[in-house]
Regions:
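Extended catalytic cores of very large enzyme megasubunits
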Residues: 1-206
Length: 206
């Protein structure tokens, strides 16, 4: 019987269950000021791993927390609703939400495109990444922090931004329908050039 292909992910830092089990969290405030003391940004009672510096906290909260469109929850994790029964929306308030939307979205697309050998391997992949993000062992580039998971976790869309993707079913280049279901989460691109400084096909053509 042929062995199923796909990635097999061995756990190094986590055990099945809660990937954040050994991480201590604390509530902090993030405040960024100008040299004259005027406040540029401030957000209180945000949840951050206790090992993070204040600089890392400020970057995470001010730059990478989604500031709108996120379902708000109570202390027990229950979604809050207003008097009309509509879900109360607001910002992300915990770095755990950010780690979750990144790792769970990566896992989702990996499973959807057949990357993993088993569901257990997909879960290991997700859990290990959550732990590595929370402990600062790994971090993606800024477009990932900004965009990844906003549609998958929060159903956010937004107007199309001119992004294109290859439809895996048809193999054809297809325009994206909105901002976040297939976002542009990359900051750098590799382009082929000749080893030449000034002539055609060289670095100046970029």
């Amino acid at each position: 019987m042929a062995q199923k292909s796909g990635l097999k992910v061995t756990r190094k830092y986590t055990t099945p269950g809660n990937p954040y089990n050994n991480i201590e969290w604390e509530k902090r405030s993030s405040k960024i000021t100008n040299p004259d003391g005027s406040v540029v940004f401030e957000m209180n009672d945000v949840e951050i791993p206790s090992t993070w510096s204040q600089v890392a906290t400020d970057i995470m909260v001010s730059k990478y927390f989604r500031k709108a469109g996120v379902p708000q929850t109570d202390a027990d994790g229950n979604v809050l609703k207003d008097e009309n029964g509509d879900v109360v929306l607001g910002p992300e308030t915990s770095s755990r939400q950010v780690f979750d939307r990144l790792a769970e979205t990566w896992r989702h697309w990996g499973e959807k495109t057949g990357y993993f050998a088993t569901k257990a391997d997909a879960q290991s992949f997700e859990d290990e990444l959550k732990y590595m993000l929370a402990t600062q062992m790994a971090a993606p580039n800024s477009p990932q922090w900004f965009n990844t998971g906003l549609n998958f976790k929060y159903d956010l869309t937004g107007p199309a931004q001119g992004f294109w993707y290859v439809d895996p079913k048809t193999g054809k280049l297809t325009p994206g329908e909105d901002s976040y279901s297939r976002p542009q989460p990359h900051a750098c691109f590799i382009q082929s050039i000749d080893d030449d400084l000034v002539n055609e096909g060289g670095i100046m053509d970029l």
